[in-house]
Structure formats: C-alpha cells, structure tokens
Design a protein with these regions (language model features):
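Extracellular/periplasmic catalytic domains that process cell-envelope and extracellular macromolecules
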Residues: 43-47, 68-69, 119-121, 146
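Hydrophobic core
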Residues: 14-26
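Bacterial Sec-exported substrate-binding components of ABC uptake systems
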Residues: 2-3, 24-63
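Bacterial N-terminal signal peptides that target proteins for export
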Residues: 2-17
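A short helix-to-beta-strand connector/capping loop
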Residues: 30, 99-101, 147
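A short, structured surface patch at a secondary-structure boundary
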Residues: 59-120, 125-134
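Charged, glycine-enriched surface loops/patches
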Residues: 78, 135-147
Length: 147
C-alpha cells in the first residue's frame, strides 16, 4: 500500500452519503468498482479487513452491516463517541472489549490526524462523513495524501 493509492480512495471517499469510502487497494486483492455520491468512480477492496473511521458515530452504521462484531475491521478511529455518547460506547465496549484498544487518530479534518499511523496500520478503507468534505479540503488532508 502507498500514500498515492490511499489518496485516490480518500478523494472518492469524501463524497459518499453518510459514510464516505476511501481505500488503498492492494494489488492482489479482489476489488469492486463503486461510484460515490459525487460521481467519482473508484476501485475498492471487495472485503476490506482494515478500516479507519473518521468519526465514532459511524460505528452505528457499521453495526448494521456487521452485527456479529462491528469493531472487527476497525483499526483506527476518532473516538469522539466516548465523549458524545458515553452510554452507547460503554454498551459497545461491554459487548466488544477490543473497542477499548482501537487507536484514536483524532479528527481527520485537522492537524491532529496522524496520516503516517493510518498508513502504518495497512489501512485499506477510510470512512469519512460527506458533511466534512469541505473541512477535509481546507485542512489539506487530501493534498497531504496526494504527496
């Protein structure tokens, strides 16, 4: 995986509905082609195993799709759920103890986000909120990923 492929995915990701998809495609992985809400076409890994979520509340949607263990694929996140919905977080943590061990990268829309750590984890998909596309552009995260 390299920064360029992660960038390609992030640019596409910043524009899908509630969850936006970005990915770094591994050459040998089976991929699918998707079109995001902005009309961008991107290839993503068909069954990603390493996902970073830009906001903790995205775990609610992931839980709908992966009811057995919504945290199984999450390798990093913005752990704001702990602050904004502590009751739900405690329930998730009780059911899925590994939630407590997931590293937080802070906000992907600010300087606190650690791009190097995201890449070092072998991240295949980054999910971001469409409402923060402008913030992602203004923070320079898309440009940083393009370098």
């Amino acid at each position: 995986m390299n920064v360029r492929s992660l960038t390609r995915g992030l640019c596409s990701a910043a524009a899908a509905t509630t969850l936006t998809i970005a990915c770094a495609t591994i050459a040998f992985a089976e991929t699918i082609t998707v079109t995001d809400i902005a009309g961008r076409v991107v290839e993503v890994e068909k069954n990603p195993s390493k996902v970073v979520i830009g906001e903790g509340r995205m775990i609610y949607s992931i839980a709908l799709l992966d009811q057995n263990n919504p945290f199984e694929r999450v390798v990093g996140w913005k752990n704001d759920m702990i602050r904004f919905d502590p009751d739900a977080y405690r329930k998730y943590e009780a059911a899925f103890p590994q939630a407590a061990d997931i590293p937080s990268f802070g906000s992907p829309y600010s300087d606190e986000w650690n791009l190097e750590a995201v890449i070092a984890l072998g991240t295949e998909v980054v999910l971001m909120n469409l409402g923060n596309l402008l913030k992602a552009q203004e923070s320079g995260i898309i440009e940083k990923l393009e370098e």
